[in-house]
A protein has these predicted regions:
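Short solvent-exposed beta->alpha transition segments
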Residues: 26, 41-83
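Terminal transmembrane helical module of multi-pass membrane proteins
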Residues: 288-340
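Alpha-helical transmembrane segments and their helix-start/interface "positive-inside/aromatic belt" motifs
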Residues: 159-176, 314-318
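Short, aromatic-enriched amphipathic alpha-helices that serve as compact interaction elements
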Residues: 22-39
């Protein structure tokens, strides 16, 4: 069964015709009206019904025109046009934000509801980045001493040596899934490119796009905050509390997806090699978190108690946070200096 897009195509073509006669604010306003009425976004059912050849295009459109959240209220009378996009104030319940319509050549490329406050001011500022840079240097120097930071670091390394078979096994499994995803992208480049666009759009929604042009220090703060809170704490260490298995499953799917979307099949080899250290370091931090969850499970199986296992999980979280900080610094320099 072919993917049913006749109405969608009509709307896009109408947008193109509007562009010749109307300003960008009016083009965006009319598009948002159609979007809120449910006449633009494909449903998941329609995506799942699409054929193999149609799936990349279906996913790309789903990511570009996601269904609006239920209860979203948009002030269409106060558009703000700047730099290829039109912003409308919006609310979702008590949560503030804005609907952003991205235009290119008079055509609506994508639309999204961007929530306010996903990145706190500290995580977008030069002061926040400078603090993290100085703290990172202090942290690295302190590891050579005898203080708490050094003691925790040595205990974490001792655990890695003690359980090296489990640690190496997790590295082989998770890095292997990342490599497998990269290879699969060579077989399905169209689908991989659609997934890549979806991941890129998700990063824009959290505010990282706004920080890209503010310099290395704000980038450092934003990247580290997001990777630490969302990547390590919420999706690795917190699931790791439930006997480690949820964290392992989440990261297994994440590594396969990241490999698929960030494959050299899609990215020029020089850029891929430049970004590879970031990928390896960030993924290593999440491997450490998954390893901590596995140690928690192993402690219970050995009847050593949940508290012992929890301590080991937190030690791995400490080590992962250290790795993430230096990964964020490298990525901030990479994006803020070399890729500008």
């Amino acid at each position: 069964m072919r993917f049913p897009w006749p109405l969608f195509v009509v709307l896009v073509q109408a947008g193109l015709s509007f562009a010749s006669a109307l300003g960008p604010e009016e083009v965006a306003r009319r598009f948002v009206e159609e979007w809120l009425a449910g006449r633009v976004s494909p449903s998941l059912e329609e995506v799942f019904r699409s054929s193999k050849d149609e799936l990349p295009q279906a996913l790309e459109r789903l990511f570009a025109y996601p269904p609006p959240p239920k209860g979203l209220r948009v002030n269409l009378d106060a558009p703000l046009w700047e730099g290829g996009r039109v912003r409308f104030p919006a609310t979702l319940g008590e949560e503030g934000g804005e609907v952003v319509v991205y235009l290119e050549g008079g055509r609506v490329e994508r639309v999204a509801f961007v929530r306010k406050g996903l990145l706190p001011p500290f995580a977008q500022s030069e002061a926040g980045g400078l603090f993290l840079l100085l703290f990172g240097v202090y942290w690295a120097v302190a590891l050579r001493g005898k203080g708490v930071l050094a003691q925790l670091f040595r205990e974490a390394l001792a655990l890695l040596r003690q359980e090296r078979r489990l640690y190496l096994g997790l590295n082989l499994l998770l890095y292997g899934l990342f490599a497998l995803g990269s290879l699969l992208a060579f077989l399905e480049p169209g689908l991989a490119r659609s997934v890549q666009k979806g991941i890129g759009g998700a990063l824009e929604l959290i505010g990282l796009e706004e920080v890209l042009f503010r310099g290395v220090l704000p980038l450092l703060a934003a990247i580290y905050y997001w990777n630490l809170t969302q990547g390590l704490l919420l999706t690795t260490l917190l699931p790791g509390l439930f006997l480690g298995l949820p964290a392992l499953l989440l990261n297994a799917s994440r590594y396969l997806l990241f490999g698929f979307a960030l494959s050299p099949a899609l990215i020029p080899l020089p850029l891929y090699l430049l970004h590879l250290p970031t990928l390896l370091l960030e993924l290593q931090a999440y491997i450490l978190g998954s390893f901590g969850g596995a140690l928690l499970l192993k402690s219970l199986l050995r009847r050593e108690g949940y508290r012992v296992g929890l301590g080991r999980l937190l030690l791995m979280g400490y080590l992962g946070a250290f790795v993430l900080l230096w990964a964020a610094l490298y990525e901030a320099v990479e994006v803020g200096v070399f890729l500008r």
